[in-house]
Amino acid sequence: MVEMKFAVRPERETPSPPAPPAGYDEPKLFEYPTLVLLLVSVPLFLLTAYGFGWLLWQIQGPEVFATLFAVTETGDSTVLVLDMIDVGLPFVVALFVTVAVHELLHGAVMRYYGQDVTYGVNLAMGAFYAAAFGQFQRREQLFPIGLAPLVSIAIGATPLLAVPVPSIAVTAYMVLVINTTGAVGDLYVVWCLRRMPEGTLMYDVDLRHMYVFEPLDVEV
């Protein structure tokens, strides 16, 4: 008789949060609804692309899009051909610069509040990040931390739509679309924070595990 043994790889345990501070309830795991956020990001992208595209059209006129499309007239028809080289390079630049600046702005506000910031890239998740691991963050601080990139980049990039250099204006348009769409997770956190009591604390154990500590003396 041949005895066969199979080694079962143990499941990865969820990292434990610290003990609750005095006056706080037991921690609750905070999770992002990944599928919901992905679905929400689609109409957000379309709305943002149309909105900023309309603004760019109003400021620059239709000729600005000549940097994106090659126009060919054949008989009674006009054919628009997307130039992938002229579009692809500004898009890649806009993507990486926007993501990097987005996270640097998160980190800058964290540092303003005296938190130690860790920057990094998680290839498995396909994400850049700025995080204050192993530190309590107050609910009131997380509002500016979460909204700083969305607001700052919008303020900085929107005026560039009026620059009379099509490549700059179009790149600014891409930055605005990428940044706004990519802020869907930040907007979700802010929406959740609005429903939490004042004084709530959040604690990042690692990139995937965030815990919420709510105060015990909450008035109903």
Where is each model-derived feature located?
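Metalloprotease/metallohydrolase-associated module, dominated by Zn2+-dependent proteases
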Residues: 2-60, 125-220
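Perimembrane loop-to-helix junctions flanking transmembrane segments
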Residues: 62-83
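Generic, low-specificity signal for short hydrophobic/alpha-helical stretches with a mild N-terminal bias
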Residues: 74, 79, 86-87, 129, ...
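Short pre-active-site segment immediately N-terminal to the catalytic Zn-binding motif
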Residues: 81-100
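Short juxtamembrane and helix-loop transition motifs at transmembrane-helix boundaries
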Residues: 81-84, 106-114, 131-139
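Active-site recognition of the HExxH zinc-binding catalytic motif
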Residues: 98-115, 149
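Membrane-water interface of transmembrane alpha-helices
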Residues: 108-121, 191-194
